[in-house]
């Protein structure tokens, strides 16, 4: 479904969070997403909107859909966001971040609690009085780079948090596990390998 070789950089090729923006009520998909993705959405009667801009292999056109939305905020780096995403989030406060690969690097856990692997993002959120757990990106595997990001290795469904790999193998794993249990999350490790940044785990 997510064979997207040749569209964007090899390290993020096939990553859902590069091609798809998702919030509680919307799914916005890059128009040049793999055909099989559109077939899957249509066959399963999953509502979505097509974005206006294609994903490409430069920074500016590979981060357009990689933003994070909560009921109150839209987090991204200003000037990089797909216009269709801005349109449906006009009522929210835009929070300027230093990292354009926002969804890769930031997870909204619940209410005012966040998880990030980016010190710049952590600084912005803490300055706003939000709770932010910093998770070292080292040991998160990704193709063609030294390390990936925590957002690309995580998915949340209800009170369950899924890890692409085993979070307990990471140097910060035990601390994060305790933090998540304090927030009443059920932790599900999808393998016994080190965490792998595959572009976020989305539930549609």
Which residues does each predicted region cover?
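Histidine/cysteine-enriched polar flanking segments
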Residues: 1-204
């Amino acid at each position: 479904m997510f064979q997207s070789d040749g569209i964007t950089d090899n390290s993020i090729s096939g990553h859902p969070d590069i091609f798809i923006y998702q919030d509680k009520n919307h799914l916005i998909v890059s128009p040049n997403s793999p055909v099989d993705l559109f077939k899957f959405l249509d066959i399963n009667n999953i509502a979505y909107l097509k974005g206006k801009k294609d994903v490409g292999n430069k920074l500016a056109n590979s981060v357009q859909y990689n933003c994070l939305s909560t009921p109150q905020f839209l987090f991204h780096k200003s000037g990089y966001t797909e216009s269709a995403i801005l349109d449906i989030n006009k009522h929210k406060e835009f929070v300027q971040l230093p990292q354009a690969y926002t969804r890769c690097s930031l997870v909204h856990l619940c209410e005012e609690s966040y998880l990030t692997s980016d010190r710049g993002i952590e600084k912005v959120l803490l300055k706003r009085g939000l709770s932010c757990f910093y998770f070292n990106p080292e040991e998160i595997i990704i193709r063609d780079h030294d390390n990936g990001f925590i957002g690309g290795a995580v998915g949340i469904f209800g009170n369950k948090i899924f890890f692409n790999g085993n979070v307990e193998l990471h140097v910060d794993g035990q601390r994060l596990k305790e933090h998540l249990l304090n927030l009443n999350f059920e932790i599900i490790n999808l393998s016994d390998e080190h965490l792998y940044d595959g572009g976020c785990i989305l539930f549609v």
